[in-house]
Amino acid sequence: RDVLGSRGLGDVYKRQMHTVEITLEQVLLARDRRVLRQRELAARYGGTLLSFTMNIAGPVKDAPLVRLALHAGLASLDRDLGQPLHRELIQAPTGPEALLVYDRPAPWVKERCLLLEEREAVGRLYDLDVLSPEGEKLSRPQSRRCLICGGPVTVCSRSRAHGLAAIRARTRDILADFAAGHLSALARQALEDEVDLTPKPGLVDRRNTGAHDDMDRPLFHRSAGALAPYFRQFAALGMAGASPRELQSLGRQAEHAMLDATGGVNTHKGALYSFALLLSALGRCLAEGGDPFDTAAVIAAALPPAENTHGSAVRSQCGGVRQEAVSGFPTARHMRGILESAGPLSALVWAMSRLDDSTLVYRGGPQGLAYVRRRAAELLRLPEETLPLALESLDDDLMARRLSPGGSADLLALALFLRAAAPEAWL
């Protein structure tokens, strides 16, 4: 169910804190600078050049939503075209830009760019100009479609059929809708990547079901799929400036959907709490600016602690996921750094050695938590190439002891999401 009602997302630009109105002269100067740089890159590399800018009508060309759309577009280009010979990003008040050079035929690059522009709504805001090694700009086989009516954009533009206000409103809607869907897809993928990672001690993975008799990988995948629409709405509510109470209400709906999908099994309750906070915070920062981790901490502090849960039963013995949230997710952020240097298994083991994991306390008491932390600390001292085999041994041990570091697994999923989303690139 769409909880936004009549609120909508069309006014998110109006609440953005750091937007700057630019002049026509600035736009023309930026275009001249871009052309000069294109010539320099053509002379240096001699390959096919791709110039990526955003079609944003009106005097405000740069905003977090615009930067997120371009950042996601670059990721799509990497998937569709492979890695370029050269890439450079330019962040300016006239809007984000990217220049890329490919060792591929220009018609091949243009064909894939056209597919990207037509694949989803946000592609209609992409301006992907392809230049041959000789400097010739490849033209489109047919005119682009109007954002408002779907007709040829050249006809509507010449006649000024729709007016700037309507075009800007439609652009805002496209960007906001894309952002919510994009972040939701990344969150779902992170949950699925976490459960598929193998071997994980005491946790469900491709090797076994860990210390759990009521869960397996397909169940976790169903759970992630059930949560995905709610992830989208958390991001949307954040952009719309929702209150903590509204977010909490949506959280209850999401939990019911998860339990319906799993037959009553709690697969992702802790992860749902963390992802709901972070997605809401990212949405708010897309609309208003700010730091997403500070924003998530403020939202978490405004929400009353849950009662009658595993987490509340052990909260007096360890801070649990709520303490992580009100602190701005420091563990997940550190784990993201480990992902870049050593990989997800090392990040998981590091968390197991440090985290006050409420799942472990619930299952094994303080002694169980201390045991897992000590064993994980021992694994951190091993050469990385020996880690998988050592993890399999620890997996067998924790299965026998019925210990599952579920809190560490949830934060690994959050770290995987942060790596994929890279909010520092667009906030």
Regions found by a protein language model. Name each.
Residues 173-238, 244-245, 269, 282-396, ...:
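Phosphate-rich cofactor/ligand-interacting catalytic cores and adjacent structured alpha/beta frameworks
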Residues 162, 166, 398-427:
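C-terminal structured interaction module
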Residues 14-84:
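General detector of N-terminal leader/presequence modules that precede the first folded domain
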